[in-house]
Amino acid sequence: MKISVEQLKQLNKEEYILIDIRDAEEAFKNPIENSIVLSGESVLSKEFDSTKKIIIVCAQGHVSDFVAQKLQEKGYDAYSVD
């Protein structure tokens, strides 16, 4: 599933976990407020609070789509930022 930046801004920060899977250099040069920086692989191996939406951000959207889909298959309410 996709979520727009505008939709994300409307959510209460307590409702979601924002995960930045861009490469570490890009993530630290241009940090996204309230995000956790992780690799796509490590996201798939972690456990998250299942009561929250999981929002995935990457540089172009392709990898975040894949990671969000895999998290959905594991039962999470996961989204890729469009």
Q: What name fits each language-model region?
A:
Residues 1-30, 76:
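Flexible, polar/low-complexity N-terminal or interdomain linker segments that lie immediately upstream
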Residues 32-38, 51-54:
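Active-site regions of enzymes building and remodeling cell-envelope glycoconjugates
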Residues 3-5, 39-40, 82:
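Short loop/edge segments at beta-strand edges and connector loops
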Residues 48-82:
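Catalytic cysteine-centered active loop of the rhodanese-like fold, especially the PTP/DSP P-loop
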Residues 25, 44, 62-64:
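Glycine-rich nucleotide phosphate-binding loop and flanking beta-alpha elements
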Residues 27-33, 45-49:
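Short loop/helix-cap segments at secondary-structure boundaries that form the rim of catalytic
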Residues 9-11, 41-50:
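Short amphipathic alpha-helix with an adjacent loop that forms part of the alpha/beta core around
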